Amino acid sequence: MERDAFERSLKAFTRRTPFHPFVVELVSGGQLQVYHPEALVFRNAIAVHFSQKGIPTLFDHQGVARMVETVEVSSPT
């Protein structure tokens, strides 16, 4: 992902009000689930994601394929 797009996307996703979870899809095929805006820290095209267990993952704009909103699937009634 281009550096400018990376920074714009992270800002947009983390600053939404109200916040909605989103997924960072990596070029390696991995996914980072961002459930809270404070679970992600970024500066100068480098980011650190903290999982719900507190495990940090470092990534940069070159390792990101795209970012997408998490879609909640409701159960049938």
Where are these regions (language model features)?
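Motif-centric detector for short Cys/His coordination patterns
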Residues: 1-77
